[in-house]
Amino acid sequence: MPRARPREETSATWSLLPLQNPMAVAMHRNIAQVPLTSEPVMELGLDVSFEDVAIHFSQEEWVLLDKAQRLLYCSVMLENLALVASLGSCTGMGDEDVTCEPAEEVVCNTSPSPQETHLLEIPVPALEEAWHQNEFLSTQPVQTLDLSRTGSGLKEDSNRHWKSYSGEKSCERDSHRATAMSSCRSHGLTEPFIRGKDGEEALSSIAGVQQQGACHSEQPSTGCLQQQATCIREQPYSSAKCGQALLNGEKHCKDGECQKGSSCKHTLVQCPSASSEKRPSECSKYEKAFSCSYKHAQHQDSHSGKRTHEHSQHEKPFSKKCRLNTQDRICPQERPYKCTECGKAFIYKSELVYHQRHHSARVHYECVECRKSFTYKSNLTEHQRIHTGERPYQCEQCGKSFRQNSSLFRHHRIHTGERPYECSECGKSFRQIFNLIRHRRVHTGEMPHQCADCGKAFSCKAELSQHERIHSGEKPYECSECGKYFRQFSNLIRHRRVHTGDRPYKCSECEKSFSRKFILVQHQRVHTGERPYKCGECGTSFTRKSDLIQHQRIHTGTRPYECEECGKSFRQCSSLIQHRRVHTGEKPYECIECGKAFSQSASLIQHQRLHTGERPYECSECGKSFSQSASLIQHQRSHSGEKPFECSDCSKPFTHKSDLIQHRRVHTGERPYECHDCEKSFSRRSNLVRHQRVHT
């Protein structure tokens, strides 16, 4: 039975407790405090029970204690309980050598759990129950002990003491338990928060003490029984409604109505007094309501793509603070969960289970529109936005919207200029990590994606997909203006500029604009004089790589472009296109001055100089100017005496290639120019013109 208190205790009395030590607390309650060593008790042969050293509080008194007083109270009670347990297990009768029954040791649950963190908030009757439960102690074998030097009667009294709690005082414990449960429910707690896992009491997680009994073993090296408990895990959030706090008293997440706190934002418990149907916060974009304002704020962040919480070490952003806290607890280098199929490692077990669906090839979710199947529901949700056209994530800067939140987050880096992914080899940075991975293959030379038809390898899968359309002939992108199809979407975008006349790339030197960026880069080399592409055979340099490739065909003799009509082959694709117009008679380039048409744009440009009188090519020797660069080159040979064209039959050299062609007709007898009036033929066109004057 609890001891009768000799005097009335008030709240003012309890406010002085933080200034007193455990001994003073016990003296204040007129309860004898047993020293924290068992030797004096052994020598005096006292009959000690746990009730002799216990301190009892009512619920009204317990509420008045602050967190330091509660922790001190629990620590002292654990010490006393450990001491009484060691005394009860190490005493015997008389001078006989007996073997003690297996003692029970205080075992602490070191695994973190929500139940442990709520321990200091439960009322004192529930703590009293926790001390007297048999499940609180786990059995540990003890060595055979020599108890001849100990007093008699302690074991019997101790056994009677524990029996009284398990038998005679069962009704009292039941009433304590009922009171504790009702009090806990009023605080928003239920029984699982009081009892630990597998029946162990939550009290086992309180910061405890290590006690050694003064028992003597037959073997000198055998240690005595030890009891210890571990420190309680601090939780930064608590319930302010009940007037209780935990160790540090911080409350990061609060419900607006009941001011109840939580250790994580997404686990904030709603006040039981609040109506479950009341949802004061509503999204203005979607008709979705939230019971807590912080959830509404998180939902709105998902539309804007904000990630307000950033890890201090890894500079990784998070949209929720609880995910940031998880990142603090586990370093990304620690990935304990490894896939047995592909060897990929993960930080969390749930991620491993999520990943293993790829290997199982199970299809769970199917689109009702196109019957496409997906392994994960989130992928199906994102896919369905293609059919609905929904783009819920909008950029606040430019108004561009996206189907996925991650796409909006990456898009924000265009406005901020952030490039978080840097190459360790060359220092080049990128906005997206897959661009960095693809760039690294430039240094390593890795080409993991290979074409099954021609064996050509590529550094990224997108390039392989585009290349495979060459074999399949697929051109999925169609121009809405002219109906022309393209293999790549980027080619369609560039083609549209033909219709719109858009030239977004402008030269800063001469104000000339271009429809494509790489053409601007090539043009700027005219101003800088840069010629980065050099021929390994003759040392000739070029401003464009395509010019170098075409030039190298002169050395190799390669003519990959062949005409289907006459079989003539060419080194350049543009030359083949121009040649085909000879067969079709197409002349798309027309002079606006005289209406004369040409098959090549270069011929039109040269012709227009006749109307303008422009002669941009001037000889540096004599100052004579020409309208065509070829004419200037031919003229300069008259000063140098160079005759590069030689006849293979008679070895006669010529200054111009046209002169060589006409000369060879002397050896072949060819006369391609024929008069329509008398059917007379000539080897030169000039001779035909002179002959036709006879008929006129």
Curated annotation (Swiss-Prot):
Q: Listed GO molecular functions? A: zinc ion binding
| Stored InterPro entries | KRAB (IPR001909), KRAB_dom_sf (IPR036051), Znf_C2H2_sf (IPR036236), Znf_C2H2_type (IPR013087)
Sorted alphabetically, which PROSITE patterns does this protein's record hold?
Answer: KRAB, ZINC_FINGER_C2H2_1, ZINC_FINGER_C2H2_2
Subcellular location, record wording: Nucleus
Primary location: nucleus
Q: Show the SUPFAM superfamilies listed in the entry.
A: beta-beta-alpha zinc fingers, KRAB domain (Kruppel-associated box)
A GO cellular component annotation here is:
nucleus
Where the record annotates domain KRAB, the positions are 48-119
Keyword annotations of the record: Isopeptide bond, Metal-binding, Nucleus, Repeat, Ubl conjugation, Zinc, Zinc-finger
Glycyl lysine isopeptide (Lys-Gly) (interchain with G-Cter in SUMO2), cross-linked positions: K349
The source's domain of life comes to Eukaryota
Residue ranges, annotated region (Disordered): 300-319
Q: What processes in GO biological process is this protein linked to? A: regulation of DNA-templated transcription
* Zn finger residue spans: C2H2-type: 337-359, 365-387, 393-415, 421-443, 449-471, 477-499, 505-527, 533-555, 561-583, 589-611, 617-639, 645-667, 673-695
Keyword field contains Nucleus: yes
Family, per the entry? Belongs to the krueppel C2H2-type zinc-finger protein family.
Q: What does this protein do?
A: May be involved in transcriptional regulation.
Name of the protein: Zinc finger protein 551
State which gene encodes it: Znf551
